[in-house]
């Protein structure tokens, strides 16, 4: 499918989704949110997703120019417009990214700011170059974090660091982001693309049905009690144990060879 604000390409089992408004540092208007939603809802058999940004930024946030009030009525109606835009465009996109049934990798260079931070962190694995940084810029314009930040950040880095990011609006550069557990890994800028592509390919060639169940269990486990989590794991093990990949894994172990998983 052809898009205007993103590009999608398929390499083997990996769907690469690139935010493609480099002249705006890949700022995300509602149209981009809708196109991301559409792209990840129809994977067409892809077994992993790699998200990148074209040019020198991952995503500089929502496109304030596209969302600006041109009516002259001022900020009062702005809150209503923001609510409607979030509910119609940005929240469905973030929910879709978080619900992708296969592994998602994001590769961050330059800013991942505002909703761009949420887009990046919605991935299962976030790799940043040393130039990459994560910014909750909302406080600088008198707004509150959105895009699921209030849910994601405390769970990733704890309430102290989440409060710092949201209330102080400080940039968290790649190396610090790795150190505090915000992201998976920070690498040299020139290694970012290769590292992210290699990880996405490795995941895509793995037992992606089981990986999808792991994703489900991790998310659900954040909200479930211990007993419910044990049951959920047992149910997942039953489902995974009936898969072709499980049979292939057992046979490859017995035959002392590398498994050839199919994601089924």
Residue ranges of model-derived segments:
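Conserved CoA-thioester-binding segment of acyl-CoA-metabolizing enzymes
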Residues: 1-54, 95, 251
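Helix-loop "lid/cap" segments that line or gate small-molecule binding pockets
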Residues: 165-166, 217, 221, 236-241
């Amino acid at each position: 499918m052809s898009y205007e604000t993103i590009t999608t390409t398929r390499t083997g089992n990996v769907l690469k989704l690139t935010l493609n408004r480099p002249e705006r540092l890949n700022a995300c208007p509602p149209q981009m949110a809708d196109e991301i939603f559409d792209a990840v809802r129809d994977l067409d058999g892809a077994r992993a997703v790699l998200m990148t940004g074209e040019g020198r930024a991952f995503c500089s946030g929502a496109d304030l120019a596209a969302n600006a009030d041109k009516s002259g009525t001022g900020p009062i109606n702005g809150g209503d417009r923001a609510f409607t835009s979030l509910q119609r465009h940005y929240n469905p996109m973030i929910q879709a990214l978080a619900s992708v049934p296969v592994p998602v990798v994001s590769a961050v260079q330059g800013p991942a700011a505002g909703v761009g931070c949420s887009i990046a962190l919605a991935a299962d694995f976030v790799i940043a170059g040393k130039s990459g940084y994560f910014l909750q810029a909302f406080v600088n314009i008198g707004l509150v974090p959105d895009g699921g930040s209030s849910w994601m950040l405390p769970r990733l880095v704890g309430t102290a660091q989440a409060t710092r990011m949201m209330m102080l609006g400080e940039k968290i550069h790649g190396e610090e982001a790795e150190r505090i557990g915000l992201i998976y890994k920070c690498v040299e800028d020139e290694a970012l693309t290769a590292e992210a592509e290699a990880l996405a390919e490795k995941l895509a060639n793995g037992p992606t049905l089981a990986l999808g169940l792991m994703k489900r269990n991790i998310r659900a486990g954040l909200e479930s009690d211990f007993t419910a989590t044990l049951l959920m794991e047992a149910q997942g093990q039953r489902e995974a144990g009936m898969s072709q990949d499980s049979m292939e894994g057992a046979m490859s172990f017995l035959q002392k060879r590398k498994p050839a998983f199919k994601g089924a």
